[in-house]
A protein has these predicted regions:
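Membrane-proximal helix-turn-helix segments that form the acceptor-binding/catalytic region
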Residues: 100-118, 219-220
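Conserved donor-binding/catalytic core segment of Leloir-type glycosyltransferases
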Residues: 167-183, 189-195, 201
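Short alpha-helical donor nucleotide-sugar binding micro-motif in glycosyltransferases
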Residues: 234, 242-247
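Aromatic "clamp/platform" in nucleotide-sugar-dependent glycosyltransferases that forms part
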Residues: 255
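Short hydrophobic beta-strand element within catalytic cores of glycosyltransferases
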Residues: 263, 268, 272-275
Length: 371
């Protein structure tokens, strides 16, 4: 088998990228990761197929629903799977998750074990997958963003502020993400109440609608937010960089993250990063952010607003972090992973052909007929 994956080779590798977000629910980080992966591979001259039933050199799974499962069961090519979530990610995201978490964990473990290799997006996910005791290799491949896309352009700041009715001279703290308990909506609003002279903007909505944990409570909380809060709702991804350009710092009070793509997006925009002090962030972002909690967020944001030297220092640190997670580096890393997985899968199948996929495919298809 020719395992060359260099973009200047005559033969282009074919990657079948699987994501149920293409014609499904958007407005969340997994869809963003899919877009960034797709675009990075295309820039690297890879032949990217989306949700294809045609043969490919390798299949790269981004989501873990039933459609992705069917693709995996019918695959003849090697499979790599991006692990964006662990069981803990479900609590505070989806309704009654604590009740059905054991079933979700069982399915997640089954799903991940169908891959030839699992690509964990952060050390936190590596640890979570370790607790699940998977039987397949796990490798750390962090998320990435196209840094150029998020660098502010002339006019963006003024245009967005005018559209949103924000004072041109106001200090703006922005959060980008879903509205759900896990994301720290309560801390965001309480901090806004304590800082009436700062404008707080939340970009993102509830893409899963009534499946969102505490959906009605979230709706009431947003409706009762103070006047210095702006909730933009679901926003086309191409417009998100403009909202970062209109802000002065990122305020990301999420209580649980496996990575935090919004952090890298904001860093690429040159914003100081005010984050909750989570164990997820330190191995990824080092000392490039200001850590806080519910009691200290207002004080941290005030220091960014009032201390120009501090603000400038953390702007530089943010840009340095963004460069580390540029999507062009992701493409290079993925190409190397594909090569290794393809070589290993070929060797393993010559030694012991895997027959489980046809059997599971038959069982799954038969189950669907019985429904």
């Amino acid at each position: 088998m020719d395992t060359s994956l260099h973009k200047n080779e005559t033969t282009r590798r074919v990657v079948n990228l699987i994501s149920e977000t293409v014609d499904g629910c958007k407005g969340h980080g997994v869809h963003t990761a899919f877009l960034q992966t797709r675009d990075a591979l295309l820039r690297a001259n890879v032949d990217v197929r989306i949700n294809s039933s045609e043969p490919a050199d390798i299949m790269h799974i981004q989501t873990m629903g039933l459609r992705s499962l069917r693709h995996m069961l019918g695959a003849h090519e090697p499979i790599v799977l991006a692990a964006h979530i662990v069981p803990e990610s479900l609590v505070g995201s989806f309704i009654l998750a604590s009740v059905w978490l054991p079933i979700g964990t069982w399915y997640m473990r089954l799903f991940y074990n169908l891959a030839d290799e699992v690509l964990a997006v952060s050390p936190e996910v590596v640890d979570g997958l370790g607790r699940m005791q998977l039987s397949v290799p796990v490798r750390l491949v962090p998320n990435a963003v196209e840094v150029r896309r998020f660098q502010p352009q002339p006019g963006w700041r003024a245009q967005i502020r005018e559209r949103a009715g924000v004072d041109p001279d106001a200090f703006v703290a922005i959060c980008v993400g879903q509205i759900q308990p896990r994301k720290g909506l309560d801390a965001f609003i309480e901090t806004a109440r304590n800082m009436p002279d700062v404008t707080f903007v939340w970009v993102g909505g509830m893409p899963f609608q009534r499946l969102t944990d505490h959906y009605r409570q979230m709706m009431r909380t947003v409706a009762d937010a103070p006047a210095n809060c702006r909730f933009v709702g679901d926003t086309p991804y191409d417009e998100v960089p403009q909202w970062y350009a209109a802000a002065d710092c990122l305020f990301f009070p999420s209580r649980q993250e496996t990575f935090g793509l919004a952090v890298i997006e904001a860093a690429a925009a040159g914003l100081p990063l005010v984050l909750r002090d989570l164990s997820t962030y330190r191995p990824l972002f080092d000392d490039s952010y200001l850590a806080g909690d519910d009691e200290s967020f207002a004080q941290v944001i005030a220091s960014v607003r009032d201390d120009a030297d501090l603000r400038g220092s953390y702007q530089k640190r943010a840009r340095a972090i963004a460069a580390r997670f540029d999507a062009d580096r992701l493409a290079e890393r993925l190409l190397g992973v594909y090569t290794e997985v393809m070589e290993r899968a070929e060797t393993e199948r010559e030694r012991s052909p895997r027959r489980w996929r046809p059997m599971l495919q038959w069982a799954f298809t038969d189950w669907r007929r019985r429904r």
